[in-house]
A protein has these predicted regions:
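Elongated, mostly alpha-helical coiled-coil "stalk/stator" tethers of large membrane protein machines
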Residues: 1-52, 56-81
Length: 81
């Protein structure tokens, strides 16, 4: 698991999503090992439903629009075969 190999995880979320995501902080925290620093921060540059995971190794865009595009791509690939 990539998150277990990193020293820190920061979840950057939009202002409209901050309250909802913060309410899930303990559940999200339980997904990483105890030695990893975990934080959730509000990012004014993000729009609603946008979310970025930052570690000391990489940045992952897990925004809803990105996930939907990936889903569409997967469905297209399945129907081409």
């Amino acid at each position: 698991n990539q998150l277990e190999k990193t020293k820190s995880v920061t979840l950057r979320v939009s202002k409209p999503d901050m309250l909802t995501v913060s309410a899930q902080k303990e559940e999200l925290r339980s997904c990483v090992s105890g030695e990893v620093d975990f934080d959730i921060t509000e990012d004014d540059s993000l729009h609603e439903n946008q979310c970025i995971i930052e570690t000391d190794q990489r940045i992952i865009d897990c925004s809803l629009d990105v996930q939907l595009q990936n889903l569409k791509d997967q469905i297209r690939m399945l129907t081409i075969m």
